[in-house]
Amino acid sequence: MTLKEAMKSIKPASQALRRQAERRWDQVAKPLGSLGVLEEDIIRIAAASGSLAVSLHPRAIVVMCGDNGIVKEGVTQTGQEVTAIVAGNMAQGNSCVCLMARQAGADVIPVDVGMACRDAVPGVVNRKVAYGTKDFLEAPAMT
């Protein structure tokens, strides 16, 4: 199947299902709209999937890892070298977020989007756009 064929096969979201999902959430014992964006997203997923029984499986927590140049001003508890250590711990399943994710049945995916380290961290997805930000007291942090 080509991309064009795949795109043509996508049907518009069902407005009838959207209204049903909204009514369903309005009947839950909670203030109307109190779940904010989460509630809106579940309603949109129901309308797009064609089912009120929304399933969010598999679950994943994507952690974007990066370093800030302002660290050199001494405003943090640790230096930038700790970011790579924490990201590596996440990749091994040894971090607080990993413990919570296991309880929720979610995977943790650490992604290097701007860690200051030069070497790849095993198990961390490399999508680096820069080696950390600049110190914003000296220059724009990101350009």
Question: Whereabouts are the PLM-identified features?
Answer:
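N-terminal loops that bind phosphate or other acidic moieties
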Residues: M1-T143
